[in-house]
């Protein structure tokens, strides 16, 4: 888990004076305690380290932190975090954890949260050279969290439960950073949201339930600047307050530069099966939901991609009118991407010109240069990857890209294909007259007339922009239609 990674990294990176110890000793425990206390800026009682054979038993207790919070009506508690460390030599440490966890937070009148994990079992090998776990597995069971939020006279109750979760990760050194991969799986996920009626009229109660028997996520990271990031955190802890940071801003900026680009690339693929959503109107469902996310870090080749795939979409009975039943998509894939932007250049420009002793810290002319640095071509590219919507009556596909920027005319090209337009039109014509669906007929007729028809009845539209701001559909400038 992230908490174990941070605590262990602080211990090893911050407490290097502890040395590489083959056996646990009282002296080693004292050094580790002092190192952790210094990096957590905490007093006695927060960190306890004791020899336990060839390992050290470590306990981190957050109670002294919470005791310093004097806000009226606030209370918090967290089970002390416990684990063991055993020196493996060569800058590697074996990490083991086996405990339940419970935590609660309360801010009177606004928040009341109570969560617990029946069991956390984790083991891994922490590598000082990487600043993270070369390998790690974590198993959690019996996770529940109940939260009550009160805002503007409305009370919302949120409940989350997960039967089991398994996480396995691996990291390898790669230059000044690390490459990593991992997989997360969980079972019996359920979330309930219940909102009471508000004090004002027109605010009825609402209840929702989201459930999935299984979820999996595969994730990768390239060029992760883990060690540099944690060294920045340690530096910030050692320089509390804005005055301390301003006094050492040159060093601070060097630490920030060392963290860049944060990562070269990260990606994640999430899959959920048999998703159900319970609402006051009935139950909706998805047989399979897929989400893909990919992004580059603070690099010159900026990139962001998100894709969604839904199979077996179902809506509550009675929600869709009979004429539209066969228009409801059973499958769709939407794939968006953004590219041709630069994050490295503006980051360098900002750091090179940042002066925390002045106000504003960045001169206005530098702020104006940042936009140009982000878009060296004057625009970004926005793409629609191969996307599709499939229903019983039709199959719609689309793909294309466009460029857009503050100083340039949008330009792009897209290809759209549709099979089943006549069937769609027949379904719309069958709608009750009061719904006004028949009014769409002229537009459908025009669209069909502009399409190129294939042998199988598939219609194709190639949509392009012109430098003058026009729009061509299969070569016809639609902006000049109708006498314009």
Where are these regions (language model features)?
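Gram-negative bacterial Sec-dependent N-terminal signal peptides
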Residues: 1-22
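Glycine-rich, small/hydroxylated-residue low-complexity segments
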Residues: 23-484
